[in-house]
Amino acid sequence: MIHDMKTPLSTIMMVQDMLKSGRLDSKPEIKNKYMSIAKSETDHLFALTNKILTISKLENHKLEMNKTEVELTPIIEKLTEKFKAKAQKPVNFIISLQAKTAYADNDYLGEVISNLIDNAIKYSKESVEIHITTEESERYTILKVRDNGLGISETDQRIIFQKYERAAAAKRSRRNGASGFGLGLNFVDQVIKAHEGRIFVNSIEGEFTEFTIYLPLETPNNKHIL
C-alpha cells in the first residue's frame, strides 16, 4: 500500500517541480501532457484514500448503506462509456441485462462494478473483451463480469480478496506497465458483504476471469446466506 501511495505522490511532485522551474512554459503541448498526468495521479491517490477510509468504516461497522431499488442499465452504461474513453487499448463490452434492478447502494454498487472493469482492462491482453451480465434467481440479483485477460491461478483465487493481496498474474502485468491498488478486490468484497451478498471468482490462467456477485433481493429482513 505504501508503494501505491508513494508512486502517484512522486509523479505529482515531479510535475510540480517541472512547472515551477518554467522549463515547460514555451512547450504548451508537453506542459498540458504533464498536467494531465498529474491530474490522473491525483485521481488515483484520491481513489486509494477513499478505499482505505471505506474499508476502515466497513471493518468497524460504521459505514451507512443507502440501499434502494436501483436501475442497473444507467450505472453500467455510464461506466462502459467512461472506460471506453479512457482505455489505452481496444475495449469491447458485451452487455446482457436480464435483471434490470438490484437492491443496493447506488454509489457503492457503481464503485464495485467500476473496480471489476478496471481490473479486467489492466490485467488483460492487447484487445479486451468484457462481458457484463445480470439475471435474477428466486432470492438474488446475480451480476457477472467476465474478461479475456491473463487469468488467475487456483492458489491466488483463494487469497485474492484479502486486504493488500495482489495475485501473481496482476503482479506480472504490473511489471509490464499496468498499475493498480492492492486494496481493490478487498474493497469490492467488503462492500458486497455490507450488502449481505457474496462475490466469487472463477478463472483459468491465460483464458479468462469471471467475478459473480449475488445481491439479495429486497425483503422485510433482507437476510440471506448462500
Regions found by a protein language model. Give the residues of each.
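Short conserved segment of the HATPase_c
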Residues: 152-165
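Conserved micro-motifs of the catalytic ATP-binding
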Residues: 60-65, 97, 101-104
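Short helix-loop "hinge" at the ATP-lid/N-box region of the Bergerat-fold HATPase_c
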Residues: 120-121
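Short alpha-helical segment of the dimerization/phosphotransfer core of two-component systems
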Residues: 40-45
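Glycine-rich ATP-lid/hinge loop adjacent to the conserved G-boxes
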Residues: 24, 165-179
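Conserved glycine-rich
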Residues: 196-197
